Amino acid sequence: MVPQTHGLLLLYFLLQLQGPLGAVVFITQEEAHGVLHRQRRANSLLEELWSSSLERECNEERCSFEEAREIFKSPERTKQFWTIYSDGDQCASNPCQNGGTCQDHLKSYVCFCPLDFEGRNCEKNKNEQLICANENGDCDQYCRDHVGTKRTCSCHEDYVLQPDEVSCKPKVEYPCGRIPVVEKRNFSRPQGRIVGGYVCPKGECPWQAVLKFNEALLCGAVLLDTRWIVTAAHCFDKFGKLVNITVVLGEHDFSEKEGTEQVRLVEQVIMPNKYTRGRTDHDIALVRLHRPVTFTDYVVPLCLPERAFSENTLASIRFSRVSGWGQLLDRGATALELMVIEVPRLMTQDCLEHAKHSANTPRITENMFCAGYMDGTKDACKGDSGGPHATHYHGTWYLTGVVSWGEGCAAIGHIGVYTRVSQYIDWLVKYMDSKLRVGISRVSLL
């Protein structure tokens, strides 16, 4: 070792200085200093003859960070060496699996995984995790699982799947579920103050329709296509014929004509044959207009989602929007401007439990869901019936419910009940493609 070499060299050097007995055996202070003085980095006299080296400075004896920096000259290389030198190589055990690359850090490591793997040690196969039940399979819109292979994504008919195989981009000028006036100015402007809601800025609820009888508010509705709207079946309980009933799209303020309105006559109403007048189950109706509307910045359809997507993904989103011109207060005046509120969806069990303890509350069925605030701060109201419960996902809005019934407007301890649209998607699609007689029809459910 170097210390032994130092001792032998010093002994040899002193012996060479000895002469006859009478000779001088001492050397000058400067000469002694040259032999005995320890330089800043040297560990022996012999080391002073060597250039700085990693082996000498850090492998044989403990070195400092400053000494390592002098050796490597590069901050990056010094840091890389020092991490391993002072902490040990955390990558020595090859913790990264499936071909992952390990990078050592102080008391830790990071794995850089191949394309199909993830996790701290690249232990998770993305294709195995990439299923529709897990965050909708990362799909923008619709997701389908396949046995033995990874899931596939698809899009609503107004959209086209992108090369990344997950994103959906519009392929028409006015795709469903988008709000042109917001996209063109890149922000929304809520203003003002349905109960506890606010005025929906003009054009920001472009799928909202209104049913009128003799020019008076009858019900809300929602646009699905150029000739079809959806509303609540109970809106037609008092009608045997479709006389003096009109639908207005592009409406915002009842007190003035704004030039964006499109008025259409009602040609046909289709409702489930299981709906009973005065009851609440199957409270949904498909309405055909006598001629198509024109899509504009203020008239855009709401997307009717695929059933699996609605039940598995949209139903798990807590807050959705409800809009309409209903009463601003219980037994109060109706709104002149279109109002909108955001309401939380309630767990089915909570909804059933609530209904069980409320007197005179209709039975909650699998064709309904509950939403709202138990404290009575926000709710849909009379006149909002038939309006949309719209849910937002990855930039697009979808129809998830139809305003059906409630126990007063925002009554404390009571909630709003909505028709669960996912139960009727196949039924709606089928009859939107059919040609039934003009008038009111009751047809079987699928």
UniProtKB/Swiss-Prot annotation:
Subcellular location: Secreted
Chain positions found as 4-carboxyglutamate: 47-48, 55, 57, 60-61, 66-67, 70, 76
Tissue: Plasma.
Site (Cleavage): 193-194
Active site positions, chain numbering: 234 (charge relay system), 283 (charge relay system), 385 (charge relay system)
EGF-like domain: residues covered: 87-123, 128-169
Disulphide bonds in the chain: 58-63, 91-102, 96-111, 113-122, 132-143, 139-153, 155-168, 176-303, 200-205, 219-235, 351-370, 381-409
Protein name: Coagulation factor VII
Lineage of the organism: Eukaryota, Metazoa, Chordata, Craniata, Vertebrata
